[in-house]
Amino acid sequence: MTGSDSSSLAGPAPEGGGGGLHGGGAAASNGVANLSVSDLSGGESRAHLTSRITSADAVPIGDADPGADHGYHGELAAILIGDEALKAKIAVLAKAVAADHDQDTPPLLICVLKGAVMFVTDFARALPIPSELEFMAVTSYGSATTSSGVVRILKDLDRDITGRRVVIVEDIIDSGLTLSWLLRNLATRGPASVDVVALLRKPEAIKVDVDVRYVGFDIPNEFVVGYGLDYGERYRDLPFVGLLGEHMYR
């Protein structure tokens, strides 16, 4: 475990929160802004970027090309979002984020480990402006398939983010509990702004209203794996987002 003294925090994720944080807030005695919940209002949403995917869009794994299961024989039910669709969407998201940032002040991309590793790699390469990378690992899952609402930092940031324009890079938002907690945690560190770009979101699973500025796909409330997403540390290596067979987790 690395990072600051807050690298081993646990507790219920607070209700509420927003998907963006921009300036403002009361000044603390050390000159760093202490941003309250009311400051987490976020910027203008980019709802037009989001594509809606339904279960009907899934391609049964048996109908896909031979070898599409990448050796996970009988474990995957379907391909929900193929690799080409992922690449195209990431290009769109990168263009939108770049348009909202000044090239002279590179955004600091905070990748939420481990699930967002594939996404942040392709996203950073697709950005037409310079960026910097940081990594943070938080968990509220354990071995369960749904969020517990209890958040723990496994790896903290390796640098001070005071005055930085931060973009949190998330693989998936389901309950919103973990992201809400993370936004509040980062707000205490004095960034100039915080936005969130998420590849996937499950609207039906949301428990906390988190205003995420950039979302690639809204997907059904089913257990998905691939492209960084795992179940029991498996399936991260898949180049697509797929549906895990129910017999694998029930």
Task: Show which residues each predicted segment covers.
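PRPP-associated nucleotide enzymes
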Residues: M1-R250
